[in-house]
Amino acid sequence: MAISYLPAILVPVIGLVMPIFCIVFLFLYIEKESLN
């Protein structure tokens, strides 16, 4: 039963988490580069 609801939960989670993860990764990368 829970498997049918999985895509409905994963799509918004991935849509929110992935951009945040990318922004944080880029921010940390830029900060690291600017320190050197």
Curated annotation (Swiss-Prot):
Entry's family note: Belongs to the PsaI family.
Q: Topologically, how does it sit relative to the membrane?
A: Single-pass membrane protein
Cysteine pairings via disulfide bonds: none
State whether keyword Transmembrane applies: yes
The name this protein carries in UniProt is Photosystem I reaction center subunit VIII
| Entry-linked HAMAP family | PSI_PsaI
Q: Which domain of life is it from?
A: Eukaryota
Organism classification, top ranks?
Eukaryota, Rhodophyta, Bangiophyceae, Cyanidiales, Cyanidiaceae
Xref: InterPro entries: PSI_PsaI (IPR001302), PSI_PsaI_sf (IPR036357)
Question: Which terms are listed as keywords in the entry?
Answer: Chloroplast, Membrane, Photosynthesis, Photosystem I, Plastid, Thylakoid, Transmembrane, Transmembrane helix
- What GO terms fall under cellular component here? chloroplast thylakoid membrane; photosystem I
Q: Does the keyword Membrane apply?
A: yes
Transmembrane region positions? 10-30
What gene is it encoded by? psaI
Q: Please provide the Gene Ontology terms (biological process) for this protein.
A: photosynthesis
> What are the subcellular locations of this protein?
Plastid, Chloroplast thylakoid membrane
| Species of the source | Cyanidium caldarium (Red alga)
Function description: May help in the organization of the PsaL subunit.
Instruction: Tell me the NCBIfam families matching this sequence.
Output: PS_I_psaI
